[in-house]
Amino acid sequence: MRKGTKALFAVMAVSALVGAAPAVDPPARPGVDAPELARLGAYPVGVADLELVQPDQADPLKGLGAPAMADRHLPLKIWYPAARAGPGTRYRTALSGETGIDVPFAVAGIATPGVAQARGRFPIVILAHGYGNTPELLCWLGENLASKGYVVVAPAFRDPPISDRSAAAFAGPLARRPLDIAFVAAEVQRRARAGQGPFAIADAERTALVGYSMGGYGVLTAAGAPLDPWVGGATRGVLAPYAAGGAKADLLKVANLKAVVAIAPAVRLQDKPIWAGSGVAAITAPTLFIVGSQDHVVGYDPGVRTAFDAEVHAPRYLLTFKEAGHSIALVGAPAEMRRTFWDIDWLEDAVWRKDRLLPLQAHFVTAFLDRYVKGDAGKAGFLDGLVPDSDTGTWPGLPRGRFAGFSPGAPTATVWKGFQPGKATGMMFEHKPAS
């Protein structure tokens, strides 16, 4: 190769490096325009992997005349408060492409694998992902909560490819979500009491459930909403004994439950109600619903708003992102997931930026869990008495210019407490007490 050509390639290589996109910040780390409680807590974050095995479980995806029986393997991603900071990590995961072939990609994380745990006893959060998702897509919330003193346990449910729209494929996630959530919660609590492994610092008496989409269906069911008997038939009989009136119905309910967060939860399937009788009215644990007003996957009204109205025996809250769709809880799309419409539609919203959506949710989830799981009454001002429409808030005496301080909330201002000027916009937040 001639010297001139070599020099040209050298210049091109340097230019490519200089012009390369900067590293993406971990989604758990909020931007400077995030509300007050979105910021990371006092603890560094560690992450561990563990597999739980539940023997002799019915698998509706296998077997001819009846579901096959096999051991159920559940890999867990566990985020926890750490004793010291570390370099962080990169989570490697994948989502099903349009052809059913997985598209691999990586997500930056603030957690460090294997770092020593902090001392203390921390509440348990079971974090349940959506249909076809993975725990890594919710790492922003797992890491953020761990930095604030929670042990977050996220099972990988290993659903069939979402491109398979058959009833047979859907039976698996429909059956296993509530069963897996109940099993994981009970086993984590058992190991916490025994001081075992990564759960030695977990407090078995304080548990919260957080679920997105199909995971939202799972956590609401595990919180006490009784399954309609038709779900038994839709799962090849797997859920029949767990449906309302069934011999095992009580086994789905998680013990020591202090709070539930349901993000864009599936509340109707095949245009039928999932739950029997009073449905979510059977839930008594405080519940935070989060949804986009244009969520055409699970529905808004009828849909998630309907469930919020119906859960009359629990104090509940509804955070609505105006014009947002269904993907509100998932990390933003990396370069690998921006090559086709199918791929980017997994992760990105038509209206909202992800670096806004995720910190906004972290703010409200933090306030909610701190109040109802940790008993921090000081967080009530971030939840109660807010003007329902964020766009109508006022702040008399606000300093002129680009003031970056946080609203003090009522009675000084009706701009939502913890928000910067002009940043509480495009949302609704509603509260209804238990009756």
Where are these regions (language model features)?
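Alpha/beta-hydrolase-fold serine-hydrolase catalytic core, especially in secreted/extracellular enzymes
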Residues: 26-28, 32, 314, 323-326, ...
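Short substrate-entry loop that stabilizes the transition state in hydrolases
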Residues: 113-164, 269-270, 296-300
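Short beta-strand/loop motif that positions the catalytic acidic residue
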Residues: 283, 289-291
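Gly/Ala-rich beta-loop-alpha elbow adjacent to hydrolase catalytic centers
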Residues: 211, 215, 219
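Short alpha-helix in the alpha/beta-hydrolase fold that links the catalytic acid
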Residues: 274-276, 299-309
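Alpha/beta-hydrolase active-site loop
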Residues: 144, 171-205, 220-221, 231, ...
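Domain-level recognition of soluble alpha/beta enzyme cores
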Residues: 24-125, 147
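Active-site machinery of serine-nucleophile hydrolases
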Residues: 79-83, 136-164, 171, 178, ...
